[in-house]
Amino acid sequence: TICYNHLTIRSEVTEICIICDDDYYF
């Protein structure tokens, strides 16, 4: 899974794109 939006990041657990909250990453 590739996230193109800079506000999203790929979750290593669910392998889906999720929204980033500041410096909080999954």
Curated annotation (Swiss-Prot):
It is found in: Secreted. Expressed by the venom gland. GO terms for molecular function: toxin activity. It comes from the Eukaryota. Keywords: Disulfide bond, G-protein coupled acetylcholine receptor impairing toxin, G-protein coupled receptor impairing toxin, Neurotoxin, Postsynaptic neurotoxin, Secreted, Toxin. One of its GO terms (cellular component) is extracellular region. Antagonist of muscle and neuronal nicotinic acetylcholine receptors (nAChR) with highest affinity for neuronal alpha-7/CHRNA7 nAChRs. Belongs to the three-finger toxin family. Short-chain subfamily. Orphan group VIII (haditoxin) sub-subfamily. Homodimer; non-covalently linked. This is Muscarinic toxin-like protein 1. It comes from Naja naja.
